[in-house]
């Protein structure tokens, strides 16, 4: 089994996160047994890793230090992170490298499409770093990646996990017009924690973005996720759930925050599996089509299976909606 240190970034925080170098080390909590996972290394994992490297692609699985990488890559599931490995934001929780990104690689959409075809994916998740340096925040690049995948793998369903496109008018419309099957944008934490956890973002802007997706294309599934263990109160989480339902979000994910390095935001506590289960029950009662809530839940974990469940839920509810008209 992987130790606590196995799940921490092995590169110095000063290298990947220069803006955090001056920060004092934050306290660390020992992980409970329910957080521990097996270290990756299966032959199937190695095969996925080989395809990713051959196509010179970046995955959020690696960059964010996802604890589920061994399980997902063994199933040939990978979440591709486009537009480079360097983010223009500096969120207190995130392990993705920060700094000044390079120019966009115009060949990347085709390389991603080639990898999706080679892996034989039935469902793929595409995410990105924040690119505040680009006039459209990278929206056109998202659209080009979607088009390239559709061209090579027309039966593959596509899920995008986007940045907030803050102060990028028209960017959201470009991505929605490209017709992904699922549009995911994570709130990450409750409103009261944004200043300390996600200072470059705005809670109500992110909510409005999710609401706007449904206004632009009601057929798209919308999705959002948060982390627990950042010091939030239960009532704040329940309010966030209500906010997401008001924005007509279909699917919510809730997982445990894990501290990447001692320079990152401290883990306030490890939330028990029973508490995660209670949030799932409450979310279903509030009207989400689907809830995924557990310590190791991540946005892209079991994304393909979840998409199939989402479609089935919507189809099951359709006759009820028609009867009520």
Curated annotation (Swiss-Prot):
Major localization class: cytoplasm
Cofactor needs: [4Fe-4S] cluster
Signal peptide from the UniProt entry: none
GO cellular component, one term: cytoplasm
Segments of this protein annotated with the region Disordered: 1-31
Keyword Nucleus: no
Entry's cofactor comment: Binds 2 [4Fe-4S] clusters per subunit. One cluster is coordinated with 3 cysteines and an exchangeable S-adenosyl-L-methionine.
Pathway connected to this protein: Protein modification; protein lipoylation via endogenous pathway; protein N(6)-(lipoyl)lysine from octanoyl-[acyl-carrier-protein]: step 2/2
Domain Radical SAM core: 73-289
Catalytic reaction list: [[Fe-S] cluster scaffold protein carrying a second [4Fe-4S](2+) cluster] + N(6)-octanoyl-L-lysyl-[protein] + 2 oxidized [2Fe-2S]-[ferredoxin] + 2 S-adenosyl-L-methionine + 4 H(+) = [[Fe-S] cluster scaffold protein] + N(6)-[(R)-dihydrolipoyl]-L-lysyl-[protein] + 4 Fe(3+) + 2 hydrogen sulfide + 2 5'-deoxyadenosine + 2 L-methionine + 2 reduced [2Fe-2S]-[ferredoxin]
Residues binding [4Fe-4S] cluster 2: 87, 91, 94
Keyword terms, alphabetized: 4Fe-4S, Cytoplasm, Iron, Iron-sulfur, Metal-binding, S-adenosyl-L-methionine, Transferase
Binding site for [4Fe-4S] cluster 1: 61, 66, 72, 300
Comp. bias regions, Basic and acidic residues: 8-31
Alphabetized Pfam families for the sequence: Radical_SAM
InterPro entries: Aldolase_TIM, Elp3/MiaA/NifB-like_rSAM, Lipoyl_synth, rSAM
A GO MF term: 4 iron, 4 sulfur cluster binding
Known EC number: 2.8.1.8
Top-level taxon: Bacteria
Compartment(s) of residence: Cytoplasm
Family statement: Belongs to the radical SAM superfamily. Lipoyl synthase family.
Database matches in NCBIfam families: lipA, PRK05481.1, PRK12928.1
Protein name: Lipoyl synthase
